[in-house]
C-alpha cells in the first residue's frame, strides 16, 4: 500500500466524515488533473462538504471539497461561489485583512487571494513542495550534527518527490500579509516571509522525528504551537522559526488548538479529550466533557473566551468559574461539524459534512 493510501486510511479513522470524505473525494480523479482543473460552479455548493471558515473583514469565507470556496456578505445568511483554479479539496483558510488570504488543501496546494476571496491563484503545490524539501534536506546534510537523521530526511524527501502531490496541507497561520506557516500530513511544514511568493521547508526545524501528521497551529505572542496525531504537541519560542516537542497529556490525536488573551492554551481531539495549559504547554489540566465525541475546531470569540465544537455539533466554551474548565453551550446541533466561526452579528456559522448552517445564539458574557 502506498503512502497516500495509508494517510487516507488513518485520517478516515481519526477525523470521521468531516475530513475523511474529502480525502476520498480527492482520489476520485488523478491529482494532476485536479490541480489543473478549475472548481466546478455548483448551484447547491452550500450543501457540499465544507471544512473551514474565515473572516475576510466583514465577509465570511468557507472552503471545502473539490475546490469549493463560498463567500457571504450577510453573516452567513446567503452564499455565492468564488472562482478557484483547482478542484482539489481545501482544508483550511485564513485572511489577514479584508482582501488578503490563503487556503490550503489536498495535493499540497496553497492558494492566495487579494480581493477578499473572489479570485485565487496557486502559490504552491505538492510537486514543488516535495522538490523544495529535497533541496533543503540535501543542503543541510553536510553540516547536520546528526548525520543519520539528516540522511534519513533526504531519503524521505526523495520518496516524497517520487510519490508526487499526494499529501495534504491541513492547517495554516499567518500573522500578517507576509509571514505565515503551513503544516500537514507526514510532518509537512513550510514557511513564507513574503506573502507566499516564495516558500521554504521548515521540516528540519520542527522536532517531529516520526513525521506525525500535523493538524493545527496556534499562536500566543512570540510563542507558536503545533498539534498533531498521537498526542503530538510542539512549541516555538522564536516566533515560529523552530519548534521543540512538548510532553503530551495523552496519546491520542489533537485536531483543535487555540489560545486566549490571558495565555491559556486549549488543545482538544479524539473522543472528547480536551486539555488546558496556563504555562505555555509545560503542563496541562484535563477539561472533561460529558460526551466522548471528537472535537473538530476551537475559536476565540468576541468576548475573549474559547469555543469548542465536536463532530456531533455540540458546543463547549471556556469558563472562569473554578472547577469547570469547559461548559456546554446550548444543546447539540445534530449535524457533523468541521469548523465554526462567530459572525459580526454574534451568531455562529458552522461548516461540515452537510454544508453550512447558522445558529442564532449570541455568545454569553465572559464572566460566566
Predicted regions and their residues:
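N-terminal secretory signal peptides that target proteins for export/translocation
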Residues: 1-7
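Residue-level hotspots at or immediately adjacent to binding/recognition sites across diverse folds
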Residues: 27-368
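Bacterial N-terminal signal peptides
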Residues: 11-24
